[in-house]
Curated annotation (Swiss-Prot):
Organism: Cyanidioschyzon merolae (strain NIES-3377 / 10D) (Unicellular red alga)
InterPro entries: RuBisCO_ssu, RuBisCO_ssu_dom, RuBisCO_ssu_sf
GO MF annotation, one: ribulose-bisphosphate carboxylase activity
Gene symbol of the encoding locus: rbcS
Family named by the database record: Belongs to the RuBisCO small chain family.
GO biological process: reductive pentose-phosphate cycle
Miscellaneous field: In this alga, in contrast to plants, the small subunit is encoded in the chloroplast. The basic functional RuBisCO is composed of a large chain homodimer in a 'head-to-tail' conformation. In form I RuBisCO this homodimer is arranged in a barrel-like tetramer with the small subunits forming a tetrameric 'cap' on each end of the 'barrel'.
Keyword annotations: Calvin cycle, Carbon dioxide fixation, Chloroplast, Photorespiration, Photosynthesis, Plastid
One term under GO cellular component: chloroplast
Name of the molecule in the record: Ribulose bisphosphate carboxylase small subunit
SUPFAM superfamilies for this protein: RuBisCO, small subunit
Purpose of the protein: RuBisCO catalyzes two reactions: the carboxylation of D-ribulose 1,5-bisphosphate, the primary event in carbon dioxide fixation, as well as the oxidative fragmentation of the pentose substrate in the photorespiration process. Both reactions occur simultaneously and in competition at the same active site. Although the small subunit is not catalytic it is essential for maximal activity.
Subcellular compartments: Plastid, Chloroplast
Pfam families: RuBisCO_small
Main location: plastid
Length: 138
C-alpha cells in the first residue's frame, strides 16, 4: 500500500530534477526548506525526525538536494520528505511538503474496529511496519 502524505502524493514518485524544481519554487517564495525522515508511516505521525537544521536563507537548490541525497544514503529504507515553511506573519505554517524517498516495500495498514461505551464503534488504523522495533521496520 502506497503511503499518501503531502503534495503530489497521488502522482508517480518525483525525479530528482522535479524535486530540484520544487525546491527552487520554495526558495523563490522565500520559504525555509528542511528535510525530515521517519520509519513510522502513520498518517497522524506529523513529528518526523529532522535531518540537520532547517536550511534558512539557502538560495541554491543544489545545497538542499545534497542534503536529500545524504539522507537517502543514511536512511535508504525510510520515508524522507522535503518541507517548505512559510514564516510570513499570520501564516507561519508548512506551505509545501512532499515525499522524496520511500521504502521498497510498504506493508500497509490494518483497520481495527473497537467497541466502546454504550456499544459505540470506534476505528483505529495501525501500520504493519510498526510491529517491528524502531530502526528495523523496513
Amino acid at each position: 500500500m502506497r503511503v499518501t502524505q503531502g503534495t503530489f502524493c497521488y502522482l508517480p514518485d518525483l525525479t530528482d530534477e522535479q524535486i530540484r524544481k520544487q525546491i527552487q519554487y520554495a526558495i523563490n517564495q522565500g520559504w525555509a526548506v528542511s528535510v525530515e525522515y521517519t520509519d513510522d508511516p502513520h498518517p497522524r505521525n506529523s513529528y518526523w525526525e529532522m535531518w540537520g537544521l532547517p536550511l534558512f536563507d539557502v538560495k541554491d537548490p543544489a545545497t538542499i538536494m545534497f542534503e536529500v541525497q545524504e539522507c537517502r544514503k543514511q536512511f535508504p529504507n525510510h520515508y524522507i520528505k522535503v518541507l517548505a515553511f512559510n514564516s510570513t506573519k499570520g501564516i507561519e505554517s508548512t506551505a509545501l511538503s512532499f515525499i522524496v524517498n520511500r521504502p521498497a516495500n510498504e506493508p500497509g495498514f490494518v483497520l481495527r474496529r473497537i467497541e466502546s461505551n454504550d456499544r459505540v464503534q470506534r476505528y483505529q488504523i495501525h501500520s504493519y511496519a510498526t510491529e517491528k522495533p524502531e530502526g528495523s521496520r523496513y
